[in-house]
Amino acid sequence: MTQATILSHGTMHCFPTGLRDEQDRLVNVEVSAVVYDGQRLILASDKPIPGAERSAVFAMDISDQGIPDDTTLEYFTAGPIARATKYEDFALTADGKYVLATTGFDRIDNESHDLNDYNHLLIWPLGEPDKVKTVDPDPRDGVEGSLELRSKLNAAIGKPYYKIEGLAAIPGKQGDGLLLFGVREQGNAHDDFEYVCRVVGAHYKITADGNLEFVDELRSLYRFDPGQFEGVRHVCGLSSLEYDPFNDRLYLLTSFETEIEGVEHIGGYLWVMALEDFAANKSPALVIDAEGAPLEFEHKAEGLAVLDKARLFVAYDNDRHMGLGDIDERDERYACEAPYTLLEMTS
């Protein structure tokens, strides 16, 4: 059994307190993606952060203890990064040399290009976000977005509506690795879907000019049902994928947002599996806490980063929920603050 021990909790300031958008609404940070590049945490909010000098993607240093230092906050403002909307996950390529970022791909306007910003897979060299490129772009000049990739996702998922919330690159049998997309929702429409924990993917290679190309067909690879596990109390959807190169395994993060007798419940669970078990379509193991019970996050766990062979960083996207619970002695967070947890993993 894999056990998680909580090392620390905290919050990160992701923009100035009291920041408002063009409609004079208070901006709320909703961190949905995080990756550790070996030097810094790279994070993203799935809602825009206004200001020409800002974007929804930003980075900050962490201490040797794994604590983020929000005084080192730096926004990534290169054109494609600033334009893409509703980021859901980050990953490093299997060789650790490039950063990948995906949006949710949960909406498109077939009559116009108005919603193309929600359909992006981006890649840039480690530490060089200004060299960002769009993966699988539309071949028409001036049309933004990974629209060729969207067509491949349509075929692999096989549903009119879906939402991508996971991204990971693992070693593969072809090319430079196997790129995995985690599906959280699928169905007929945004108001007619089921929560799922499903993975589709394809092998890829990195081109000479630093872009990513798929070398085989995007296809369904894996699926499991958290509800079949004892101790899982809520219906979950996949919220993040993370490859652990130190232990050659895959983490799967799931989260829930349900209403029971008029009371809203949010939270999440963490799962782990060896890569050979993933390839064999075996069930993942539910991570337990120090008491041996299933680890259940009290916040909506959406972002996951491997820091080293033993430590994980979990970021929460609580939407408009402002309560901090065990994260802090304060009752509520500021809208500019994102809560997080640092875990130590043992087997």
Language model feature labels by segment:
Residues 1-347:
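Sequence/structural signature of beta-propeller domains
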